């Protein structure tokens, strides 16, 4: 096993970037490949807004923003939002959609580690949704998010647990049976157990506040948040006050 960590500037999996570049033009198609993201976005936004005590007037960073679905919705809540992504095409789509929607979001193509080196403790809220399982060194991303948030600020992560059920649900079910997302979107080896994520959080100024599962019911075709983190889950952390 290679124990070398990717350099700060290269914590990027170009195969992962290519996957999303290929379908970027359909990011805002409510019936396309990103339909699940559109479906779960109200749940994500509601969780972030409630746990943060509202977003109005706050400075927010969305790490791995893609085409801007969450970033735009947080801007609509009155936040000043910056979106980071390493995919050129998704960012172009995000910028164009924000322009067409009259929503102001600043989008930047750089890694979160690079951003942290220049903007430490600058954000009230940092979000990192469905991104950790797509990079070579997710631990480095967690550390960078911790560096970017202000003392007392909130950091949110969401990812997929690594076990047999998550493989069946997120890979076999979502990609091959229900065809909710393109085949090859996920690699179960890159999924992250909650204990692993929490161990990385514990290495920083962040402290766990709450964890919840994101559940899909194929019979009713609905999503909900609730107990149980065996497949998708969201974690709310808070930075220690100075």
From Swiss-Prot:
One of its GO terms (biological process) is methylation. This is Ubiquinone biosynthesis O-methyltransferase. GO terms for molecular function: 2-polyprenyl-6-hydroxyphenol methylase activity; 3-demethylubiquinol 3-O-methyltransferase activity; polyprenyldihydroxybenzoate methyltransferase activity. Keywords: Methyltransferase, S-adenosyl-L-methionine, Transferase, Ubiquinone biosynthesis. It catalyses: a 3-demethylubiquinol + S-adenosyl-L-methionine = a ubiquinol + S-adenosyl-L-homocysteine + H(+); a 3-(all-trans-polyprenyl)benzene-1,2-diol + S-adenosyl-L-methionine = a 2-methoxy-6-(all-trans-polyprenyl)phenol + S-adenosyl-L-homocysteine + H(+). Its EC number is 2.1.1.222, 2.1.1.64. O-methyltransferase that catalyzes the 2 O-methylation steps in the ubiquinone biosynthetic pathway. The keyword Kinase does not apply. HAMAP family: UbiG. SUPFAM superfamilies: S-adenosyl-L-methionine-dependent methyltransferases. It comes from the Bacteria.
